[in-house]
Amino acid sequence: VSQSIEEGKVLLDEVKKTGNKVLVGHHRAYSSIMEKARNLIKSGVIGRPVAVMGSALFYKPDSYFLEGMWRTQKGGGPILLNLIHEIGNLRYLLGEVYAVQAMSSNTVRGHEVEDTSAITLQFENGVLGTFLLSDTAASSRSWEQTSQENKAYSSYEDEDCYHIAGTEGSLSIPTMRIKRYLKTEDRSWWKPFDCSVETSQRDDPLVGQIDHFCRVIRGETEPRVSVKDGLQNLMVVDCIVKAAQTGVLVQVAIIE
């Protein structure tokens, strides 16, 4: 949405003044996988969500940085470039992020910016979460390498990048594997889960995004990802950066 919180607030103020419709390009908001996961959580199949584990672990080749040295400098690390999309996903699934803690390292690449981060999140509804982020990890536990939405990436259909646990069961994403207790009185680690897999479409969300954009232009609908949404994602990420720098819990301001 913008390079800074200040610029984003200026844009939001202008949108409020003019009434113009502005669509922010968070393409995962059009993912059929995410829509399916959100509907499953809302259905109560896993009960009340209590915890989430997420990861964006991948290896960016040296050529990625040589082609754009700005990626090694402030504002070019995986927190701003990659994690912001993960935050959008988690907010879509679980609601607003209330507070964050984080640790970051640039030990492997030695760039000005981080290459690896470990993050904890507290959501407004009480859900707690952890997230691992690295662009120097030889792993497939990332959205790109599990969702199969962008065919340019190698993908592994048995891998997940999100796991959401509730009081009745758990959901792994994007495989849509569900483990749950069929009876509330059976909830015990001594008892087996009922295991199932929900089917979901794996369409290209970029197509859905441009179709939606055209509908917004024609005045047929409101932007799915507003400036407010985009700015809220940026504010969470900004708090994560501050938390990593200071080592303290940072509360996230919620835009009204």
Identify the residue ranges that each predicted region occupies.
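Hydrophobic residues in well-ordered beta-strands that form the structural core
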Residues: 22-24, 53, 131, 173
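Short, well-ordered coil/turn segments that N-cap beta-strands
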Residues: 18-22, 48-50, 125-127
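A general structural signal for well-ordered alpha-helical segments in protein cores
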Residues: 8, 31-34, 86-87, 209-210, ...
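Rossmann-like dinucleotide-binding domain that binds NAD(P)(H)
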Residues: 64-157, 228
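NAD(P)-dinucleotide binding in Rossmann-like oxidoreductases
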Residues: 110-114, 124-208
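Rossmann-like NAD(P)H-binding beta-loop-alpha module
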Residues: 32-67
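C-terminal helix-rich "cap/oligomerization" subdomain common to oxidoreductases
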Residues: 9-12, 17, 173-174, 212-256
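Beta-strand-loop-alpha-helix segment that lines the small-molecule cofactor/substrate pocket
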Residues: 1-27, 44
